[in-house]
């Protein structure tokens, strides 16, 4: 099951990459935005990406394993992702199709498929942290889904160096979200999720931004789950977006062994 655990850990991080990507501006055109304008820009541009395809490598470091692989990911809004793990010479080792509600993971070498429903209990068993599915996805990738915040101010808003800093407090759950957004490229550069006593549960760093169809994407992503002492590093080699021809065709072989998990 280690391969399945690696897949789940990686795919949750990749799932909403397109959520955190926003158009970039040249340095000379950058302007200082009010929190209201920044939030509106981030949310409006978040919705522009309809699909996403990327190829790259990921490396996972944890107490249980240290390993990496080459992968391909295809995401279709609003909530589906196809993920393929590649071995030497580009040979496929595993495939998966995931939605917000369900997942199916196919171990090609053993001709075995695992499938089931996604829920917060599964996430908590994997990540040992009490967060909802959407909160965990946002935390890993640094997306700013500000739909619920369009008409209210952040708990704190400031400028530090070349970054806007957006802070959101949830007093009921005793959680604090802090997003750092580059003033020039308007991309998420850092994200932290803190629990009570200001302890960091999850932290993400995003760098090596490149402009694709007037959208800035981080080609390097580092996410630390400090609760479980895990770290994943993602380096993209190629990214394409909004390809109308992009389709996912994933079917299990008739003789595959299927396990409900």
Language model regions located:
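An acidic-aromatic
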Residues: 80-134
